[in-house]
Amino acid sequence: MANCENNPWKKNAWGKNEETAEEPIVSFADVLSEEFIEDLSVQEKLEEERYMKQLDQMFGDTSVSDDQLPINTEGMTDEEVALALQRHFDREADVARAVGSSSSVHFTPDRYHPKTMQETDSENEDDDALRQAATDMLYAKLDEENATNSRLRPEGPSTSRTKHDTGVSGRRNADKTFNDRNTLPTGDMVGDKLNNKVFNKLMAFGKSESKRQMRNKDKEEKATMDTSVDSDTRLLLLKWINQGVFDSVDGIIATGKESAVLHAAQDSATSYAIKVYKTTLSEFKNRSEYVKDDFRFKNPRGVLKIWAEREFMNLSRMAKHGLPCPQPVKVRRNVLVMSFLGDQGLAAPRLKNVEWEFFTDDERRNVYDQVQSIMCRMYKECLLVHADLSEFNLLLTPDNKVHVIDVSQAMDLSHPRSLQFLTRDIQNIITFFTRIGTPNLPTYVQLFNLITDLDMVEDHDLLVQVEQFSEENRSVDLRHDKSRPADMELKKYNEEKKANRGISPAREYN
């Protein structure tokens, strides 16, 4: 017990022990009854009246000045003083509320308002006056300089400037040119001026230059317009170098309308030609003649993938029959690796670039006989038509041996227009060798009959006869293939792919 009495935490702040008030136990039915509620309200009123009578006895009717407290605090604790003051304030509020109950205006004692409520958020009147005066002076000055009304214009010569002033417009044009990205790089133009004529020309040139740059078909990482080597192609070449297919890629041998040829070396004695097909065939205007209505030629990169694989298959067929052509090595997407035709890293010249004035008639005739043999063997043994044979696609090696290249567009004899393309090849070859002075050349019809073993009339136009022959001798399968060229090309593609595969026990079941 002594410990409990000496414990400061067990005492009240006012020096008295706390006595727990025991609340009376009331049933739930009594709480809901109206009589019980009325009794509680009556008891509260009686207690309030008792407190009011005590206050009246304590203070009486004497008035209290502002310097005096309303109660005698002698012998009272702080809690008793606070309670007495609170009851006094409550009584004053009740009296004021009772007096003003009959009026529509209610008065509340100011002593209950905090000081923050009496302050305002408005700005200082002096600051507002100064700000307004400064604003008026600024507008008055602007009105004097830029007044357009004659009544407001000051006397004497005019000093106002408009946006059409030479100096103002010159500085504005220089600033626009300096900050415009579409025009040429200008460097530091601080303090310079440009007249309207020069500025308009620069802006027009900048717009035309930006439009010209946007006319490129593909982006830089996808397009192969110039060198045919984009990021994907470079990555593929690097992978082949790591695999040991070749050691280095030296440079460009030649460029054409659909591809570019690069030189690759494995050692001092072995070289390869890498043919990279362009992903944009803007220069190959008549490509549709070769691949019209073919489902494989919708996507540009899909086109070049099939185009490279098609040349690989044609070269494989020609090499299988022993025709003079590059030996195919590897193909992937739009990149084809084949043997290099040339000597000591120098590519063999095309017939177009050969200096024929140093050749004799017999040597020229020998070159023609080789070309004629290539055309006949391609038609009869390989069942192919070059479809783009000319002096640009024939190479002459140092030992005067002719090799045929660029057979990506070569087509099978089942193609509906194979004879028409053969006729064009014959015309190109005869025209070229006639121009270089080759003796004893056959006519178009004679060479056509020699290659195809047909009997065309010499006196009539060869192309007309070929078209008529194609119409009259086309079989039912050819008519069906012409109406569905995609199905025909897919069938031939699968047959060639199956024929070029090696011997396998599962070949009959695939």
Curated annotation (Swiss-Prot):
Chain sites annotated for binding ATP: 241-249, 275
Cofactor(s) in the UniProt record: Mg(2+)
Deletion consequences: RNAi-mediated knockdown causes no obvious phenotype.
Keyword Heme: no
Catalytic activity: L-seryl-[protein] + ATP = O-phospho-L-seryl-[protein] + ADP + H(+); L-threonyl-[protein] + ATP = O-phospho-L-threonyl-[protein] + ADP + H(+)
Any one annotated GO CC term: cytosol
Active site: 388
Domain Protein kinase: residue ranges: 235-510
Transmembrane segments annotated in the record for this chain: none
Alphabetical list of InterPro entries matching this protein: Kinase-like_dom_sf, RIO-type_Ser/Thr_kinase, RIO_dom, RIO_kinase, RIO_kinase_CS, Ser/Thr_kinase_Rio3
Pfam families per UniProt: RIO1
One of the protein's GO biological processes: maturation of SSU-rRNA
This protein's name: Serine/threonine-protein kinase RIO3
Record organism: Caenorhabditis elegans
Name of the gene encoding the protein in the UniProt record: riok-3
